[in-house]
């Protein structure tokens, strides 16, 4: 019975952690939390886009 609980717990941990990595940055707070800044249209210079800040035109750049 303990093995069933352990396997269920392992399955839940794997599924819950995988869902967080597939989603991009989608808000101002999560952008700032990932050490990014929100800018209109494009990321300048050597910065790259890591997500969007609520609107598709506002990019989260780091």
UniProtKB/Swiss-Prot annotation:
Keywords assigned by UniProt, alphabetized: Antibiotic, Antimicrobial, Defensin, Disulfide bond, Pyrrolidone carboxylic acid, Secreted, Signal
Tissue distribution: Neutrophilic granules.
Signal peptide: 1-22
Gene Ontology process terms (BP): cell chemotaxis; defense response to bacterium
SMART domains associated with the record: DEFSN
GO cellular component: extracellular space
Modified residues annotated as Pyrrolidone carboxylic acid in this record: 23
The keyword Signal belongs to this UniProt entry's keyword annotation: yes
Origin superkingdom: Eukaryota
Listed Pfam families: Defensin_beta
Disulfide cysteine pairs (residue numbers): 31-60, 38-53, 43-61
Localisation: Secreted
GO molecular function, one term: CCR6 chemokine receptor binding
Role this protein plays: Has bactericidal activity. Active against E.coli ML35 and S.aureus 502A.
Protein family: Belongs to the beta-defensin family.
Record protein name field: Beta-defensin 10
